Amino acid sequence: MKSIALIHTVKSVAAGFDDSLRNYLGYEVKIHNLWDDFLADNPNETGEFTADNRNRLFLDIKAQELTGADLIVTTCSTLTPAVEMIRPFIKVPVIAIDDAMAKKGITYGDRVLVMATAGSTVGPTVSKLQREGEMAGRQLSIDTCVCAEAFKALKAMDMELHDRILKEKAGTLPVYDCIVLAQASMAHLEEEIGAVTGCPVLTSPRLCVEEIKNKLEEIRQ
């Protein structure tokens, strides 16, 4: 039986990603979860992902590697730049939650909005989209929108307030070729924000589980 090791930073994502992944795969797998909220809270408070944070993430990833997992997945976009640095030192594939989303995000057009609740997520997501655009020979125009009050509601597990803040903000946005919801904790609003804005909306979990399934199929062959 294949096994997957997940690294989370947000409680609501940790609570739901496991079941979503099992349902999508359609076959039995072992899943090992590690939740480290410090790696989201500290960068959001300090405005940077420090060397100490990178070392902490490295230890988290190594700990999950020691479970014997076939695949490691990080479910927080704030971690992605550090994940890319750490990958060469890990024996198994490491997937970042926004890998697939960034690749798809550049296919709709050059005007992209990155919407987030945690400021620490914006820089990594914008950088990843820009790199994907450069590799495709495209120059993107990327705007950002951070709803900090929604992040406070998320930390308090007040999802009703979290959702209301984001939907109200979405109603004020201009038209974009694509809106990227930068955090997995926003994914359940994909259809509603799409309806409010009239724009294509991308979320990372759905695209990530597709990538996980494809990678597991490669490993099983």
What spans do the regions from the language model cover?
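Non-catalytic structural scaffold of enzyme domains
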Residues: 1-221
